[in-house]
Amino acid sequence: MRERGGDWKMEQLRGRIISRGKGEGEALTTTQPISFYGGVDPNTGIVIEKGHQLQGISVKGKILVFPQGKGSTVGSYTLYRMKKNGVAPAGMINRECETVVAVGAIISEIPCVDKVDISKIKSGDRVKIENGTVTLL
């Protein structure tokens, strides 16, 4: 919940649906693009890209908030493998989703939304994604 004029209210952000579904969890945010192929360990869900803001942190069960993906198209299948291994994020929110993340979210059935002002979401926030709506709880 966010404090607005002395009251606590839920804030809702509307975005574009990339992958339908519902996900809820703690936000894990970065201002850097993410490469799932080679940047995230598909067996543990830990970001392994050297120098990345999230290096050493697990995305498992988190609402992963990042500007966009980057890297190889194999990243889509890395997301799928993460889902099968039980270490995928509970949902993803992008400023601008690109093909690799979109395909990975869809085939893995991970809720994903883009066209959202991701600067409003901070690591540790409780977040719910339901289709095109992002709710900060």
Please annotate each region the language model reported.
Residues 2-9:
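Short, Lys/Arg-enriched N-terminal segments with co-localized hydrophobic residues
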Residues 11-23, 28-135:
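Feature captures the catalytic cores and cofactor-binding loops of soluble hydro-lyases/lyases
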